[in-house]
């Protein structure tokens, strides 16, 4: 859970009741984050949501109805409780299920404000003082779960600003975009300037960013007064043009916000950036000053996340800038028109792994590798040295002496968990013991891979951090196994740790508690066994059943219970004292005096034995020694549980964050490069792709023999696929032909192959020679349907 980040105080008179406090908080946070905001207030051991119901049946005050539908909760009325004449409604859930419902609310775009009881500052036992603990939204929520199908959780901020140019007659538009992936801490910013036209083309670059990053939460900041009087209508159009359709969208006018005003001040920007990226970062990273609107957007986003959960932006990566000296330009929806990424059509979705080039060719085995390949395939480059290095490594891995490594890599990497996400969970203190177990097991897998590769000098030179992986792996494993009983952590998925997972010798106070608990628990178990043996021996009962049962509850601890009928028998047997001479007790029981025996070395004093009702059919066995013993065991259990929780929290911060974090980071880069390499190699081998050859030339060109469309050749299995030869020089070519002969398919195949080559992949050709391109422009009408095998003409005919 996040640290305390705010304590709200109303400007008006102090609300008298908890219901008024709740409604006051709700009103305040709705103003900040919009109508889709819900306050979760801790009351006792529950989180509760309140609302008001008028005499006419109207419900107001909060989003309690939506909350009940999303979380499948019942709404109840508080009897004899009202606020301003309105009946108070209530819904809620136990404290320990908070994580589950935060996930549900975040998934549908709600912002959840978690308010807890301030136990430390309550006066005279008053438990009704409350403080804001954390704020969660779709783009700022990170759970304890590691094994999620969702690879990224991106939050995006778009800053739209209009201005009048001295050299241009028409109004100009500039928009800066910032994206942060809270699963990895990586960020991206870019800026685009253009003459304003109210059409989709103006927002091509924005649409490309939205398509690539698929944000789950978007903040739209706008000042479009120089363009239109109806800014809200234009913002609605912009969302449509850019494909912004996530559940959580916040819209703010720049002129009406103090926060945006701060983000336009250079002193504030410099101070904020230096806080996260070190002193002089503004001067050394010239892109911050070159792209001021994008930087403003980034600063606003940092502040927004910090308000929600300050830990999320600890050790955040310096942003990647959209325009670099080696990245090719992708214009006019290139990625979608070439099916590099999904177009989200029904036919595309039904096609599964063939829905896009990315889905088909991304054969990475780890979430880390899958994210890295997505970044690669959406950012082609024209850096010839880097490209040739990638081709060389794939060729080397395809050789007979190395290809056997690929199956080994895929098997080992399949068991490697999302280490990047775990790094963020460590920073926000949301690491369950089961996550630590997965981290430990994953590092062992990486260690095994590294041992096998140490003799391969070329591969070691290619993989980043290869020289320190052995030390990093050993450090992480030794730190974890030196503190925790690793196997005991395997199935503990919550933050509440009740099992004994801390190793003996780590903490002397815990060891003393454990020793005392062991002695007390052994005595309790001894009493339990003794009473059962008395019944079995005296009545010749089978040995495979307990006639005196141990009943344990979290609140009351352990107790010994027996049926009412057998309780009378047991009392008589103990009073007659005939059991002590029976053969089964020989050598293990000594009678000290009436009502006192020495059983297996433990003194049991049951002289004051009594029975009290426990249930309708059972009674609880009590005597002074047993009552004190069960109370002591319960107290020790709570003490041990608290001590383990404290030690585990210290372990996460002092060991995982302070001592292991940098080592995990090095392993992440190593795994990412290894997984991407094996994926590229595996795809090339499985699909018979060839190595691109980069040729010298004054201008970009390509010459492909036997070029194929990487999706169509798998989607259309009912006909023989006919490959094509094509050569495009600086003058281009005119491609023409009759209907349904594959013109569009060939155009797409050329575009896909060239982009694959410039992403460091082998390509679906017999041979492919080219000079890398610095920009890609596509204009392919989306009237065909490659998933159904229909050309543009075929689609038109089928619609008749």
Where are these regions (language model features)?
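A conserved P-loop NTPase coupling/switch region
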Residues: 46-79, 217-219, 223-278, 355, ...
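Long, charged, glycine-rich C-terminal linkers/tails
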Residues: 117-118, 312-322, 531-552, 679-706, ...
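Basic, polar low-complexity surface loops/patches
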Residues: 1-373, 378, 385-399, 403, ...
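SMC-family hinge/dimerization module
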Residues: 308, 312-361, 547-550, 554-607, ...
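N-terminal accessory targeting/assembly segments
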Residues: 505-556
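ATPase nucleotide-binding head domains, primarily ABC-like/P-loop NTPase cores
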Residues: 171-173, 287, 291, 569-576, ...
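Structured, non-catalytic alpha/beta "coupling" segments that mediate domain-domain communication
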Residues: 219, 294-339, 349-350, 359-360, ...
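Residue-level signature of catalytic and energy-coupling elements of molecular machines
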Residues: 44, 105, 218, 369, ...
């Amino acid at each position: 859970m996040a640290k305390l980040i705010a304590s709200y105080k109303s400007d008006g008179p102090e609300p008298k009741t908890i219901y008024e406090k709740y409604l006051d908080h709700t009103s305040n946070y709705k103003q900040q984050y919009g109508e889709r905001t819900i306050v979760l207030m801790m009351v006792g051991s529950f989180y509760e949501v309140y609302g008001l119901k008028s005499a006419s049946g109207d419900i107001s005050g909060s989003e309690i109805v939506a909350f009940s539908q999303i979380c499948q909760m019942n709404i109840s009325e508080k009897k004899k409780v009202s606020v301003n004449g309105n009946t108070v409604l209530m819904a809620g859930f136990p404290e320990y299920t908070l994580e589950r419902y935060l996930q549900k609310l975040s998934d549908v775009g709600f912002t959840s404000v978690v308010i807890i009881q301030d136990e430390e500052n309550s006066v005279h036992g008053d438990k009704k003082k409350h403080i804001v603990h954390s704020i969660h939204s779709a783009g700022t929520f990170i759970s304890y779960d590691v094994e999620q199908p969702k690879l990224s959780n991106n939050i995006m901020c778009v800053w739209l600003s209009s201005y009048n140019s001295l050299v241009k007659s028409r109004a100009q538009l500039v928009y800066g975009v910032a994206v942060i992936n809270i699963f990895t801490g990586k960020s991206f910013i870019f800026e685009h300037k253009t003459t304003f036209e109210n059409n989709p083309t103006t927002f091509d670059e924005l649409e490309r960013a939205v398509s690539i990053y698929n944000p789950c939460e978007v903040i739209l900041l706008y000042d479009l007064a120089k363009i239109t009087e109806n800014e809200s209508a234009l913002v609605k159009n912009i969302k449509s043009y850019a494909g912004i359709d996530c559940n959580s969208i916040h819209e703010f006018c720049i002129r009406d916000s103090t926060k945006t005003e701060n983000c336009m001040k250079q002193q504030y920007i410099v101070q904020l950036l230096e806080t996260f990226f070190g002193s002089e970062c503004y001067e050394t990273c010239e892109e911050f000053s070159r792209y001021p609107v994008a930087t403003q957007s980034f600063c606003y986003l940092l502040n927004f996340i910090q308000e929600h959960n300050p830990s999320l932006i600890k050790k955040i990566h310096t942003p990647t800038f959209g325009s670099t000296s080696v990245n090719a330009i992708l214009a006019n929806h290139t990625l979608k028109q070439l099916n590099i990424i999904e177009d989200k059509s029904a036919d595309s979705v039904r096609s599964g792994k063939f829905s896009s080039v990315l889905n088909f060719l991304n054969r990475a085995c780890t979430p880390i590798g899958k994210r890295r390949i997505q970044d690669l395939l959406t950012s082609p480059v024209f850096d010839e040295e880097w490209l040739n290095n990638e081709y060389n490594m794939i060729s080397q891995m395809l050789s007979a002496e190395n290809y056997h490594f690929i199956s080994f890599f895929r098997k080992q990497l399949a068991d490697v968990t999302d280490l990047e996400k775990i790094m963020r969970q460590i920073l926000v203190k949301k690491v369950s013991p089961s996550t630590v177990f997965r981290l430990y097991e994953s590092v062992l897998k990486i260690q095994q891979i590294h041992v096998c590769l140490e003799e391969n000098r070329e591969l070691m030179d290619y993989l980043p951090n290869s020289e320190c992986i052995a030390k990093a792996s050993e450090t992480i494993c030794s730190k974890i196994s030196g503190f925790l009983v690793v196997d005991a952590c395997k199935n503990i998925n919550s933050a509440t740790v009740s099992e004994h997972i801390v190793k003996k010798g780590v903490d002397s106070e815990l060891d003393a508690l454990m020793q005392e608990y062991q002695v007390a628990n052994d005595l309790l178990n001894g009493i339990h066994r003794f009473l059962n043996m008395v019944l079995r021996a005296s009545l010749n009962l089978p040995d495979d059943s307990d006639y005196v049962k141990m009943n344990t509850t979290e609140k009351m601890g352990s107790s010994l219970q027996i049926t009412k009928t057998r309780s009378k028998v047991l009392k008589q047997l103990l009073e007659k004292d005939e059991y002590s001479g029976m053969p089964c007790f020989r050598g293990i029981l000594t009678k000290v005096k009436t009502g006192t025996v020495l059983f297996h070395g433990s003194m049991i004093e049951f002289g004051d034995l009594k029975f009290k009702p426990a249930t309708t059919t059972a009674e609880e066995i009590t005597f002074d020694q047993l009552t004190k013993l069960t109370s002591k065991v319960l107290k020790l259990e709570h003490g041990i549980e608290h001590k383990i929780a404290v030690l585990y929290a210290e372990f996460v911060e002092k060991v995982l964050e302070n001592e292991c974090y940098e080592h995990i980071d090095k392993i992440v880069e190593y795994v990412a490069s290894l997984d991407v390499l094996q994926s590229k190699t595996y795809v090339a081998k499985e699909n018979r792709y060839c190595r691109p050859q980069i040729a010298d030339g004054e201008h970009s060109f390509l010459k492909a023999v036997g070029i194929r469309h990487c999706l169509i050749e798998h989607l259309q299995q009912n006909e023989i696929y006919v490959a094509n030869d094509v050569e495009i020089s600086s003058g281009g070519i005119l491609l023409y032909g009759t209907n349904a002969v594959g013109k569009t398919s060939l155009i797409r195949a050329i575009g896909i192959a060239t982009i694959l080559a410039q992403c460091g992949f082998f390509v679906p050709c017999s041979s492919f020679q080219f000079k890398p391109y610095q920009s890609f422009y596509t204009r392919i009408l989306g009237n065909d349907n490659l998933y159904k095998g229909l050309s543009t003409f075929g689609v038109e005919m089928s619609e008749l």
